[in-house]
C-alpha cells in the first residue's frame, strides 16, 4: 500500500494537462507506441474536436522509480474549464495529491487558482510543475515567483518540463513519488469505496469508477449501495491503463472500475459509498457537495415522436454528468420537452451537442435564463427558472436576481478595458490587488450577465490574457421584467426573456429585428411585437408576398382595379385569421445572441 500514489492534474485551459498525461502514460508503458494518440484520455469525439477535456478520466500506471521500487500511480485527468469545476472537485476527493501545471509562458490564471484552493481545502499535497519550457516565450523564474506570490505555495524548486518534447517528464514522476503521500486506509476494516464517476455501457450496464478508501473489493462480492440500500453482485472489476483491464480484486487505496450489472440509471449515484452487504461499514464517506445548476433552458425535440428517445438519452447522460438537472416541461409553441439545468453556457452547448451526436436527436433550445427569487404580494418566496413561470406583474412584490462573485486575473495593460466591461455588465467592484504585473480584480456581477457571454467578451477585450473564475454569491433585489414576444397578437411562450428594466427597450427592439430576419415571408403580414405586460415596446412586420392582380388590366377603368385589389385584400384577411406561422430553429437561436453584438 505504501507504493500507491493517487494524484490528479489541475491546470488552466490549454496549459497542457492532457499532453502531460500522454507523456506519463508513454514513459510508464501504459500503451504501446502504436496505440498512442494525441490526448489519449480525451476519449469523447467532442472533446477531441474542441480540444478541451470535459470528463475526468482515470489511469493506473506502474512506474519503476530510481530507488529500484515499483510504484503504482493512479492518476485522474481533470477538465480546466470553469463550467466543469465540479468534475475537478470529484477527482480531487479521490486523491492525496495534485500536480499544479502552469504554463511557463502565460503564468498563473484564475482557474488554476480556483482549482488549487479547492485542492488545498481538501488537504491535498500540491506539487507545482512548470510546463512548456521549450517555448521561446517561457520565463520559468518569473512564473515561479508568480506562483509563490499569488497562490502562496513554495515553487522555487518546481519541476520544469516540456510535455510536448518529453523533456523533464522523468523528474515529474520522481517528484510524484517523493512529494505525494501514500494513501491512508485500513485494509482490515469493512469496505468503503467512493464512486467518483459512473457511465452507461450498452453491454455492461452501469460502470462505476471507484476509489477504495478502506477494506478491499473482490470479484463476486455482494455489495450494497449505501444511499439506496440495494444489493448487487460484482460481475467484473479492474483498472484502466487507459484500456479497461480486468483484475480479480481492488485493494485499499486503489482506483478502479466496477460492473455490478446495474441496469437502472439511478442505481449508482456519483459521490455515493459502496460497502459489503454482510458486515459492511456503518456510515458513508463524505461525498462531494451537490452542484446547483446556474443556467436553465428548455430543450424540445423537433419532432414529437422523439420524446421517448430524448427522455432516455437525458437519463443516460445525467448518469455520466452528475450536474445535469432536468424536469418535463410543455410549451404551447413547441410541444413536450424538458427544462434542463446547466453549470454554464459551455456546459449547455456540450450537452446539446452530445445529445444530438451520441443519441441522434434534433433539438430546439429556448433562451437560457438563470434562477430568480421572487417574493409575491402574498409574502411567498418562489424560485423561477423559466420566464413562463414568472407570476403576473401585479402579483410580484420584488424580483431578486442571483449575483456572482467573479475573480478576474488580468495583466495591468488591459485593466481599463476589463473594468469598463464589468461596469457595462452592471458589476460592482469589491476588491483590486496588484501582484507584480498581474491585477486580481473581484467584482459582483449579476449571474445572468456572466453566463450569457461575459467570458467571451472578457477574452476579446483583453486579447485572451484575462482569466475568470466565478461562483454564486447571493440573491439581490433588482428591477427585472419579462419581455414577451407576440406573433400576430399571440404570445409565443418559448420566446420570452427576463431582462433588466434599463435594457428592456433595447433588448426588445433587437429581439424583434432579429426575428424579422429569420421568419420567412408568408401570404399575409406577420406582426412581431415585444411587450412588457400589456405595454408594447417594439414592433416590426414581415411583409406579405402578394400576386400582382393588376397585371392583366391594360389601361382600363380604375374601379376595375379597385375591385381586384379589394378582393385580394379580403382574401388575405381571411388567410390571416386561420393562418399560423412556422418558426424555424434559427429564430430560437437568434434569441440566444440578442445583446451579444
UniProtKB/Swiss-Prot annotation:
<keyword id="KW-0342">GTP-binding</keyword>
<dbReference type="GO" id="GO:0045727">
    <property type="term" value="P:positive regulation of translation"/>
</dbReference>
<dbReference type="Pfam" id="PF00009">
    <property type="entry name" value="GTP_EFTU"/>
</dbReference>
<dbReference type="GO" id="GO:0005525">
    <property type="term" value="F:GTP binding"/>
</dbReference>
<keyword id="KW-0648">Protein biosynthesis</keyword>
<dbReference type="InterPro" id="IPR027417">
    <property type="entry name" value="P-loop_NTPase"/>
</dbReference>
<keyword id="KW-0472">Membrane</keyword>
<dbReference type="InterPro" id="IPR006297">
    <property type="entry name" value="EF-4"/>
</dbReference>
<dbReference type="InterPro" id="IPR000795">
    <property type="entry name" value="T_Tr_GTP-bd_dom"/>
</dbReference>
<comment type="function">
    <text>Required for accurate and efficient protein synthesis under certain stress conditions. May act as a fidelity factor of the translation reaction, by catalyzing a one-codon backward translocation of tRNAs on improperly translocated ribosomes. Back-translocation proceeds from a post-translocation (POST) complex to a pre-translocation (PRE) complex, thus giving elongation factor G a second chance to translocate the tRNAs correctly. Binds to ribosomes in a GTP-dependent manner.</text>
</comment>
<dbReference type="InterPro" id="IPR005225">
    <property type="entry name" value="Small_GTP-bd"/>
</dbReference>
<dbReference type="Pfam" id="PF06421">
    <property type="entry name" value="LepA_C"/>
</dbReference>
<keyword id="KW-1003">Cell membrane</keyword>
<dbReference type="GO" id="GO:0003924">
    <property type="term" value="F:GTPase activity"/>
</dbReference>
<dbReference type="InterPro" id="IPR031157">
    <property type="entry name" value="G_TR_CS"/>
</dbReference>
<keyword id="KW-0547">Nucleotide-binding</keyword>
<keyword id="KW-0997">Cell inner membrane</keyword>
<dbReference type="InterPro" id="IPR013842">
    <property type="entry name" value="LepA_CTD"/>
</dbReference>
<dbReference type="InterPro" id="IPR000640">
    <property type="entry name" value="EFG_V-like"/>
</dbReference>
<feature type="domain" description="tr-type G">
    <location>
        <begin position="2"/>
        <end position="184"/>
    </location>
</feature>
<dbReference type="InterPro" id="IPR038363">
    <property type="entry name" value="LepA_C_sf"/>
</dbReference>
<protein>
    <recommendedName>
        <fullName>Elongation factor 4</fullName>
        <ecNumber>3.6.5.n1</ecNumber>
    </recommendedName>
</protein>
<keyword id="KW-0378">Hydrolase</keyword>
<dbReference type="InterPro" id="IPR009000">
    <property type="entry name" value="Transl_B-barrel_sf"/>
</dbReference>
<dbReference type="GO" id="GO:0003746">
    <property type="term" value="F:translation elongation factor activity"/>
</dbReference>
<feature type="binding site">
    <location>
        <begin position="14"/>
        <end position="19"/>
    </location>
    <ligand>
        <name>GTP</name>
    </ligand>
</feature>
<dbReference type="InterPro" id="IPR035654">
    <property type="entry name" value="LepA_IV"/>
</dbReference>
<feature type="binding site">
    <location>
        <begin position="131"/>
        <end position="134"/>
    </location>
    <ligand>
        <name>GTP</name>
    </ligand>
</feature>
<dbReference type="Pfam" id="PF03144">
    <property type="entry name" value="GTP_EFTU_D2"/>
</dbReference>
<dbReference type="GO" id="GO:0005886">
    <property type="term" value="C:plasma membrane"/>
</dbReference>
<comment type="similarity">
    <text>Belongs to the TRAFAC class translation factor GTPase superfamily. Classic translation factor GTPase family. LepA subfamily.</text>
</comment>
<dbReference type="GO" id="GO:0043022">
    <property type="term" value="F:ribosome binding"/>
</dbReference>
<dbReference type="InterPro" id="IPR004161">
    <property type="entry name" value="EFTu-like_2"/>
</dbReference>
<dbReference type="InterPro" id="IPR035647">
    <property type="entry name" value="EFG_III/V"/>
</dbReference>
<dbReference type="GO" id="GO:0097216">
    <property type="term" value="F:guanosine tetraphosphate binding"/>
</dbReference>
<dbReference type="Pfam" id="PF00679">
    <property type="entry name" value="EFG_C"/>
</dbReference>
Amino acid at each position: 500500500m505504501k507504493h500507491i500514489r493517487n494524484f490528479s492534474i489541475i491546470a488552466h485551459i490549454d496549459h497542457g494537462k492532457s499532453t502531460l498525461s500522454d507523456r506519463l502514460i508513454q514513459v510508464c508503458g501504459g500503451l504501446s507506441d502504436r496505440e498512442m494518440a494525441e490526448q489519449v484520455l480525451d476519449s469523447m469525439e467532442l472533446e477531441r474536436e474542441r480540444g478541451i477535456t470535459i470528463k475526468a478520466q482515470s489511469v493506473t500506471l506502474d512506474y519503476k522509480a530510481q530507488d529500484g521500487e515499483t510504484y503504482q500511480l493512479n492518476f485522474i485527468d481533470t477538465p480546466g474549464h470553469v463550467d466543469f469545476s465540479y468534475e475537478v472537485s470529484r477527482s480531487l476527493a479521490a486523491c492525496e495529491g495534485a500536480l499544479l501545471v502552469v504554463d511557463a509562458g502565460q503564468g498563473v490564471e484564475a482557474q488554476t487558482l480556483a482549482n488549487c484552493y479547492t485542492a488545498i481545502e481538501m488537504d491535498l499535497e500540491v506539487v507545482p510543475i512548470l510546463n512548456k519550457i521549450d517555448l521561446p516565450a517561457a520565463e520559468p523564474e518569473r512564473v515561479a515567483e508568480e506562483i509563490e506570490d499569488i497562490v502562496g505555495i513554495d515553487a522555487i524548486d518546481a519541476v520544469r518540463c516540456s510535455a510536448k518534447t518529453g523533456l523533464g517528464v522523468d523528474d515529474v514522476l520522481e517528484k510524484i513519488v517523493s512529494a505525494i503521500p501514500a494513501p491512508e486506509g485500513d485494509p482490515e476494516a469493512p469496505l468503503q469505496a467512493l464512486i467518483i464517476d459512473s457511465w452507461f455501457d450498452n453491454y455492461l450496464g452501469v460502470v462505476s469508477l471507484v476509489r477504495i478508501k478502506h477494506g478491499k473489493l473482490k470479484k463476486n462480492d455482494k455489495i450494497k449501495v449505501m444511499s439506496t440500500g440495494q444489493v448487487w453482485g460484482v460481475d467484473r472489476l479492474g483498472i484502466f491503463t487507459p484500456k479497461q483491464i480486468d483484475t480479480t480484486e481492488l485493494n485499499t487505496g486503489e482506483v478502479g472500475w466496477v460492473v455490478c450489472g446495474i441496469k437502472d440509471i439511478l442505481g449508482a449515484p456519483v459521490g455515493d459509498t459502496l460497502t459489503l452487504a454482510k458486515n459492511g461499514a456503518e456510515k458513508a464517506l463524505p461525498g462531494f457537495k451537490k452542484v446547483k445548476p446556474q443556467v436553465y433552458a428548455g430543450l424540445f425535440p423537433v419532432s414529437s415522436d422523439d420524446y421517448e428517445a430524448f427522455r432516455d438519452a437525458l437519463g443516460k447522460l445525467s448518469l455520466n454528468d452528475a450536474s445535469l438537472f432536468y424536469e418535463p416541461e410543455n410549451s404551447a409553441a413547441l410541444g413536450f420537452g424538458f427544462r434542463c439545468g446547466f453549470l454554464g453556457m459551455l456546459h449547455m452547448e456540450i450537452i446539446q451537442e452530445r445529445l444530438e451526436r451520441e443519441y441522434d436527436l434534433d433539438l430546439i433550445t429556448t433562451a437560457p435564463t438563470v434562477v430568480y427569487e421572487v417574493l409575491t404580494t402574498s409574502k411567498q418566496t418562489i424560485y423561477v427558472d423559466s420566464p413562463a413561470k414568472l407570476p403576473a406583474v401585479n402579483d410580484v412584490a420584488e424580483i431578486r436576481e442571483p449575483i456572482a462573485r467573479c475573480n478576474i486575473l488580468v495583466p495591468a495593460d488591459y485593466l481599463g478595458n476589463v473594468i469598463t466591461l464589468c461596469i457595462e455588465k452592471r458589476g460592482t467592484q469589491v476588491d483590486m490587488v496588484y501582484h507584480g504585473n498581474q491585477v486580481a480584480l473581484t467584482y459582483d456581477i449579476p449571474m445572468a450577465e456572466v453566463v450569457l457571454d461575459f467570458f467571451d467578451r472578457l477574452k476579446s477585450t483583453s486579447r485572451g490574457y484575462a482569466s475568470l473564475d466565478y461562483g454564486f454569491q447571493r440573491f439581490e433585489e433588482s428591477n427585472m421584467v419579462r419581455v414577451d414576444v407576440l406573433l400576430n397578437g399571440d404570445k409565443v411562450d418559448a420566446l420570452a426573456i427576463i431582462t433588466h428594466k434599463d435594457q428592456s427597450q433595447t433588448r426588445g427592439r433587437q429581439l424583434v429585428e432579429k426575428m424579422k430576419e429569420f421568419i420567412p415571408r408568408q401570404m399575409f403580414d406577420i406582426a412581431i411585437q415585444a411587450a412588457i405586460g400589456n405595454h408594447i415596446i417594439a414592433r416590426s412586420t414581415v411583409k406579405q408576398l402578394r400576386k400582382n392582380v393588376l397585371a392583366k388590366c391594360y389601361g382600363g377603368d380604375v374601379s376595375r382595379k379597385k375591385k381586384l385589389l379589394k378582393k385580394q385584400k379580403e382574401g388575405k384577411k381571411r388567410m390571416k385569421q386561420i393562418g399560423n406561422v412556422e418558426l424555424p430553429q434559427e429564430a430560437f437561436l437568434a434569441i440566444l445572441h440578442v445583446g451579444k453584438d
